[in-house]
């Protein structure tokens, strides 16, 4: 079993396991994941360790299918590693139908609780087993566990009151969503969807008409037409007696070759015509509009990424890539004309966990360094700057303000940017700087207070 993962930049993920206790429903023991702990990062950026633990109950093995159907309940504990490894929150996922062949992997409810058991959020799911239209042979029938209803709730931690949104779905004989209704206090929203049916080509999932309404009033209505291959050739946006119509044509590979937009007050219609490459038939090489303007793109054959783009004014942009497919240079029209090797150049230093960007400037290039921690998170940037000091301009490195996070990835403190000697621009700065603000959260992850450096 996998016990640990070492990330490319040096961070670690450690996984622990334990065995379940045998029971009648689950004879024998099973190894289950008991905890996951991630370590890494810089201490000055806050928490360097996060941890979740897991508990399982209600495991079931079907004796007829000779297969394990999963646990009825899984609890995930969120541990506050910055506060003595105390329990902060926990969530419970329930698989209430884990004794059925078709539904044993479906969540029937999930709730988030505070450490002392007060509900924060919840969702309840109900499913309907539908037999899809596959012919008259019942032995070949396909059963689809369709989500029939979903009720999502947010709870007030203090009073226990809740605000809920209920969603109900209906489906057609092919399992397509046909009706959607969202209901909450004093509000409801409905969507009804129909589909094209090209049975001989098994195309039954392309919407033909959709209506969105509330309280008997239609707020959005769309309809489509398709060709014999199921490709949408027309989209109509119903706007009373003045519908907006889009038309599309396709090539033999299914690419859009022409898209025509709705007409204006003079009955004129804008269109865009697309041309594709001759090798892959998927890369757009030119675009032409109704005015005769055109733009084009040439591609790097190794990465299928743009190498030269030409806009409608004939101005070019050039792009190059390194041996790993990463952006290496970008050259804009002015630099192409003046013969400069780049407008922007990118350099990568994974061993030092940093990237370097150089912006060309006649007055001197602008360097930008981005530093990552061992968990591969960007934590600091530095940029060339000029400040007035001692009666003259001084070239410095401007260090981004530090963001400090807690054990759950929330920003709890922010610090102002600072300057340093330009000679240190390529080295990570461990200094913290001046405090800007501290932020506190509730167990819903909502901001409850922001305190500035002066205490206000």
Regions of interest found by a model, annotated:
Residues 2-6, 13-16, 25-27, 32-45, ...:
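Beta-strand elements of repeat-based all-beta scaffolds
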